[in-house]
């Protein structure tokens, strides 16, 4: 499943975006949360309205103990998609 917003990206940007998201997800699964957060930031530069990416970066930052930054991302994901329940877990975990 492709992240939201990829259809609006130009072909070159779209492939870069998808590869960056793939790498960020792999880094997170491998426990390299710093790399994952950095790659999610790169992907967000290409698609700044992706609630999924903000949520994923929030989770990575939460795992690194960066609670204030994780909360900022959780808040932004909630602003972009208020009905998305997954982000609420990260939101409340920051407290």
What are these regions (language model features)?
Residues 1-95:
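Alpha-helical tetratricopeptide repeat
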């Amino acid at each position: 499943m492709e992240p939201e917003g990829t259809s609006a990206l130009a072909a070159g940007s779209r492939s870069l975006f998808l590869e960056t998201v793939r790498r960020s997800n792999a880094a997170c699964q491998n426990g390299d949360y710093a790399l994952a957060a950095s790659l999610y930031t790169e992907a967000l530069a290409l698609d700044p309205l992706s609630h999924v990416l903000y949520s994923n970066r929030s989770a990575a930052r939460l795992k690194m103990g960066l609670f204030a930054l994780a909360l900022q991302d959780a808040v932004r994901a909630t602003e972009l998609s208020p009905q998305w329940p997954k982000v609420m877990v990260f939101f409340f975990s920051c407290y």
